Amino acid sequence: MLGKARELANYQDEPEQLPTGSFGKNAFLRLGFERRPERTVLATLHRRAPLIVQQALYWDEGMPTLPCVSIISNAGGILQGDRYAIEIDLEPDTQAHVTTQSATRIQEMDANFATQTQTITLGANSYLEYIPHPIIPHKHSRFVQQTEVTIHPTATLIYSEVLMAGRKYYGTGELFHYDLFSSKFHAAHTDGTSLFTEKFIVEPARGNVSRLGAMGSFHVFGNLILLTPKTHADRLFETIDPVFDMDEGIAWGASRLPNDAGLLFKVLGMESAPVRAAIRKIWEAARQEVTSASLPENFLWA
């Protein structure tokens, strides 16, 4: 059970407001994509507020048959005692793009914690872009996320995560004032073969996050996990050169995942825009490699 994670041992007290996981704090979302003759459709949609999805739209000019889904929250952010669960299921030969409406704000907490579990299943020859907006942890917030991926060897997943240092421009600034951010990602093939696990725990009060070997002088962390067949991963890896440019405030690099699972791309930056732009470059290259489709111009408001 995610709430029993070791790093949450000090945050088991109940909020004085609504009880943990009660109505309005126990969000659930299930998205099921199926193939139709002309395109992929969002065939299954189950939702429980605060997580909301209205419908799939087809606005991607590079892939006109790609259903694009925005996850919306009507809660104004993730609050103490919230328990979120998201399930995304792609049938064979389907394609989908999933994002969030805006940045995910993890609100300030004085009791308990918040969790989110994500379960993603990709069938044969399926393709998923899961590109949420950044996560902004507020002062004293505690958040644990666990992502479980089951993927067919012929499928592709582009999964990104951007973590801000906090509300950098709020008042005198909140940089690494949150209590806990924990994120675990595990991937396995559909036959049960485990591919890899990555987990990082950030507890700024227990260690200097700005030290060498961690964030250094950077404020934004970007993580892109590309699960794809080895032939695609090999070609993409050869095109990615590491960058470390303090004048521009950006650094990135790529490495291969264990068991020929794909690639891992990490970015550090001072602001979110350059980090997201770097992730977008890899996303664009991966889409071109796997689907031969282009990525449309970014929206002016994105």
From Swiss-Prot:
Keywords: Chaperone, Cytoplasm, Nickel insertion
Pfam families found in the cross-reference section: UreD
Top-level taxonomic group: Bacteria
Primary localization: cytoplasm
One GO cellular component term: cytoplasm
Subcellular location as annotated: Cytoplasm
Family annotation (InterPro entries): UreD
Keyword Kinase: no
Gene Ontology molecular function: any one: nickel cation binding
Function description: Required for maturation of urease via the functional incorporation of the urease nickel metallocenter.
PANTHER family, sorted: UREASE ACCESSORY PROTEIN D (PTHR33643:SF1)
Subunit: UreD, UreF and UreG form a complex that acts as a GTP-hydrolysis-dependent molecular chaperone, activating the urease apoprotein by helping to assemble the nickel containing metallocenter of UreC. The UreE protein probably delivers the nickel.
HAMAP family from the UniProt entry: UreD (MF_01384)
Name under which the protein is recorded: Urease accessory protein UreD 2
Organism: Brucella canis (strain ATCC 23365 / NCTC 10854 / RM-666)
